Amino acid sequence: MANACTFEGFPSDRKVLKVLTLGHSLTVDSCHFLALIAAAEGDPGLKIATLYYSGCPLSRHVEYLQTDSDRYSLYESNSAEPTPPRITPGMTMKKAVEQEDWDVILMHGGTFEPAYETTYGTGHIQTIQDYVNQHKTNPNAVFGWHMHWVFPTDPELMALYPYTPNGYQVGYEKFGGGRKELYEAIARCMEKYILTDSTFRCLIPTGTAMENALAAGLTEKDIHRDYAHATDYGRVMAGYVWYCVLRGIDHLDDIKLDRIPVKYFRSNKGDQDILLTQEDKKLLLEAVNNALKKPLQVTQSQYTVK
């Protein structure tokens, strides 16, 4: 085991590592800067693709693979030529799986789904894995799981949900707890169902890194841009967690990414590069390293955000 998140048999030592994720917007957020991060770390061999459908739960993945639906979009980037992800609409899961000889296929649930034990007894995970195994072109490809982050409870962020009723307020009401309780429920399910499933060879604890950042004194508005999604700072944090797990890094010595070029922003993100300060890097490094060391536990920070 290279670290607490990368298990025996994970192909982290490949010079070129090809990764396909089956996800939604939180996956897109996590991978948005991943190629840029890998390039900054001197690693030109990471290729990442996300098969995206908005908020996609496991049940919808099953529906779409059974009907060969082309309602997905495929987001692709690679660290040899780090640019914002290229988006191809009208993609099916079959086409995405067969497109490359992927080394790793990553999965995760939709919105609140990973917090419920009933999620892991539906058979959806097995159905998706069977389908991928049927169509993958690399017989040695392995599966991993993305432990995505908990959603903000800040009223101003929650109010940015564009529909009525508010799906995230309803989700929290149905769950019956707050942010802390939701994180703990997800962590319990990871320990009980994912870490004990030998078909998964890695766990990417993005959600734990986010909670570690909050423990350092950051606010939800520092890491979330709305009711669910990450700020650019949150995206960098998520990207570093992904990079370390995918490359089997158990401890990151420093953050080599210095700036995020303006071409990576959406239109409402301004017109200048984002520079990462030493304070930014210090907090990022701690949150990421603590998540790698203790992926299912929030670690209190030695820093205090002013």
Q: Residue spans of the language-model regions?
A:
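Residue-level signal for beta-strand positions within conserved beta-sheet cores that form or flank
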Residues: 15, 44-46, 139, 199
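Conserved SGNH/GDSL esterase-like catalytic core that processes O-acyl groups on lipids
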Residues: 26-122
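Alpha-helical cap/lid subdomain in secreted, periplasmic
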Residues: 90-228, 232, 244
